[in-house]
């Protein structure tokens, strides 16, 4: 735009060229002011972008720190859960071993009960024929006095002892 104005002024003469140059100078000054204004805006925008990038980096760093703290917390929580599972598993194994022992005791006691019931049935069915002629009962010096004497039944009151390893080997549970 300045070139056209200067061309037109150079064809018209010296006087008009001075006034045109003055206009051109004032145009240059406004252009300079405009450029300065644009440069100032660019500087402000760059500074604003730098601040925005800094804030963004800070947000990202804070987010990373938060995630790192969360990972640490979750790992600690996971370790506690794993430890709890180990304790629970140990309790389970212990209780299972105790249950195996109790099952073995139940089997033995059922066997003893069955044997005693068979003896009682035999004694009741046989009581009419043995010892009646002599006046002796079966339990007062008669045939079964040695078997049914409470003093001879002491071994029945002994606790059944089984170890966890033998119970596991026997039952394979």
From Swiss-Prot:
Pfam families: bZIP_1. Residues 39-102 form the bZIP domain. One of its GO terms (molecular function) is transcription cis-regulatory region binding. SMART domains: BRLZ. Residues 67-81 are annotated as: Leucine-zipper. Disruption phenotype: No visible phenotype under normal growth conditions, but seeds have decreased germination speed after imbibition, without affecting overall germination rate. The keyword Transcription applies. The keyword Membrane does not apply. Expressed in the micropylar endosperm and radicle tip in early germinating seeds. Residues 8-22 have a biased composition (Low complexity). Keywords: DNA-binding, Nucleus, Transcription, Transcription regulation. Residues 30-41 have a biased composition (Basic and acidic residues). PROSITE patterns: BZIP, BZIP_BASIC. Residues 41-62 are annotated as: Basic motif. It comes from the Eukaryota. This is bZIP transcription factor 44. The lineage of its organism: Eukaryota, Viridiplantae, Streptophyta, Embryophyta, Tracheophyta. The gene is BZIP44.
